Amino acid sequence: MKMLWNNFKVAFAMYSKIPMPMADWNKENMKYTFCFFPFIGLVIGALSYLVGWAGGKFGFNPSFVSAVLVLVPVMVTGGIHVDGLLDTSDALSSWQERERRLEILKDSHAGAFAVITACAFFLIWYGAYSQLWTDRRALLIMALGFMVSRCCPE
């Protein structure tokens, strides 16, 4: 049981900004960390649903609610997945040799294609949320998507 609790803490410490108690970070204790990824998605989904529900309940401006909904996963995860998307976009859009693309992946600077991809990514999410946030079932499905997408580690 202690090992599972440790894996839970490691998963949240690595893939979220949610503060966790100190975990024992060794290879043997991290074997089942991936099993707890869906719980991180569950937290993101629950917060997203709560924001959508509160936005409707208290009559917030739809544009504001949609913008906050887009930011919830970024705030919970620290943007780790967005960073990976943007690095990949820069590398694949460079049309360079394989070695140079790998260098671009490791580069901490954002290139033009990363900025374009970020704008498109956030605009698409904003558009989806602005259309669906008032429909509780659609919002629930989108919220559950954060959990389901983390159920398959590969």
Summary of predicted features, one role per range:
Residues M1-G78, L92-R100, D107, F113-E154:
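Hydrophobic alpha-helical transmembrane segments
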Residues D83, E103:
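Glycine/small-residue-rich loop that forms an oxyanion/phosphate-binding "nest" at active or ligand-binding sites
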